[in-house]
């Protein structure tokens, strides 16, 4: 086997010894860490759901089945997609994925990544809450 390969963009890629060792260590000794991360992310899902119900009831959350990405149903806000993007980016200062990126069914939705410290998530939701209040 060659010590290098070509990437999709035509660039030469070199496999690094530490990458192999890291993967081996993760598979051999990563169960406890993974369990903790999964538990923390589940806590962030619950936190987001509660926060939205209590503070931004016009935005509903679609509970993820096996992900740290949450779709926010913002259709009750009555905004078109351009206005919705402006609300998130310019008013709330948040960079989420536009739901229409995933097809026309995503109109009125935004996708939120909750794989972050809870304090960061809480701050983001507070910024969103303030932006919605100011509509």
Give the ranges of each region predicted by the language model:
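PLP-dependent class I/II
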Residues: 1-135
């Amino acid at each position: 086997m060659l010590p290098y390969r070509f990437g999709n963009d035509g660039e030469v890629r070199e496999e690094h010894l530490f990458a192999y060792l890291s993967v081996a260590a993760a598979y051999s000794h990563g169960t406890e860490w993974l369990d903790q991360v999964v538990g923390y992310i589940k806590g962030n899902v619950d936190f987001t759901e509660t926060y939205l119900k209590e503070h931004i009831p016009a935005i509903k959350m679609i509970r993820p089945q096996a992900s740290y990405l949450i779709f926010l149903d913002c259709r009750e806000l009555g905004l078109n997609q351009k206005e919705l993007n402006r609300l998130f980016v310019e008013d709330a200062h948040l960079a989420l994925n536009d739901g229409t990126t995933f097809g026309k069914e995503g109109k009125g939705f935004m996708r939120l990544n909750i794989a972050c410290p809870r304090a960061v998530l809480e701050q983001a939701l507070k910024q969103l809450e303030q932006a919605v209040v100011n509509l």
